[in-house]
C-alpha cells in the first residue's frame, strides 16, 4: 500500500500563501485538490504531492 504524506490546512495556507477564505473558495469552485478525511479524527488534510503540483501549475498574478 502506498502512503502519501498529508498536510493540514495551516500548512496548506502557508505553502500556498493564501487565506483560509480563499482556500475554501477555491475548494467550492473545484479549483483546488480534494481534501481527505483523517482516519480517527474529525479533521481533514490534503495530499502533499497534489498541493505541490497545484502550486507549481498555478498562474502567477501581478
Regions found by a protein language model. Give the residues of each.
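Major-groove DNA-recognition helix of helix-turn-helix-type DNA-binding domains
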Residues: 16-44
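Short helix-start
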Residues: 7-9, 34-58
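Polyanion-binding surface elements
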Residues: 1-22, 56-57
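Short, charged recognition helix plus adjacent turn
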Residues: 61-62
Amino acid at each position: 500500500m502506498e502512503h502519501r504524506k498529508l498536510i493540514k490546512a495551516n500548512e496548506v495556507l502557508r505553502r500556498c500563501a493564501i487565506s483560509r477564505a480563499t482556500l475554501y473558495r477555491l475548494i467550492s469552485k473545484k479549483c483546488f485538490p480534494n481534501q481527505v478525511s483523517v482516519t480517527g479524527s474529525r479533521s481533514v488534510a490534503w495530499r502533499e504531492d497534489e498541493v505541490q503540483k497545484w502550486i507549481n501549475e498555478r498562474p502567477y498574478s501581478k
